[in-house]
């Protein structure tokens, strides 16, 4: 599900078929004021927060995640959650790309290369940290076999979300000219 408003604020849930089971990548996107925006480790808010979970997000479970994932280290997590992460936009590049797409244009590759990212993760937690599932539990459930596989999947899915996110925002800026 992709339940974001025209400004890109809301919740997105991606269902991942691993051939053995399903996982869900849950995203909470919010608006940050310029005062709230920082890449420093002491930040308390981020443009997007994520979790990779092995439990299907029912209404109740999604609400539990909504109350905890945006809090990151201050939230409460269980072995159902495999990874916890967060990211901030490159506001300059995100706005540039969404403006170009809204105008029906493709962004200039040189501009993309100058910054290199739409969003940048500022932390990726796994392996039992903050109550998340540890590697042995993940292996017992036959979800992943090697260390850091869940974290790398989470980072990859965050990148995929960033493309969907910027296109969503661009479309809502100008549905008639968006490409």
Which role fits each region the language model picked out?
Residues 2-43:
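Amphipathic, interaction-prone secondary-structure segments
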Residues 44-179:
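Mixed-charge, Lys/Arg-enriched low-complexity segments
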